Amino acid sequence: MIIDPERVAKIMRETAEIDVLPRFQKLSESEIMEKAPGDIVTVADYDAEKRLTAALKDLLPGADILAEEAASRDGLDLEDYQSARTTWLIDPVDGTRNFSKGEPTFAIVIALVKGGQT
């Protein structure tokens, strides 16, 4: 299994252009929610995660996906994926608090893990 990093980078760029950057410094209060006390999420997180999940499933069919917002909702964590299976790890907007405040310190983070190795 060889994944071209440029294909992953393209998916990340497209997601940033469509779901994240158009909302930067433009979020309304109703687009920022608290998923747990002190832990916020935005519509950009949800939309970006949905797009990234679909694109990465297409790129590597059969791989598991552990995405931050779905994992938070479903009560999953990395320990649930400690196996030889291939798993995409997704943080659709790493630095959500900064993003929600209009501070330019955030990123889309993706890792591919197989047998505990990235």
What spans do the regions from the language model cover?
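N-terminal subdomain of lithium-sensitive/metallo-dependent phosphomonoesterases centered on the IMPase/IPPase/PAP
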Residues: M1-I90
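DPxDG-like acidic metal-binding loop motif
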Residues: D80-T118
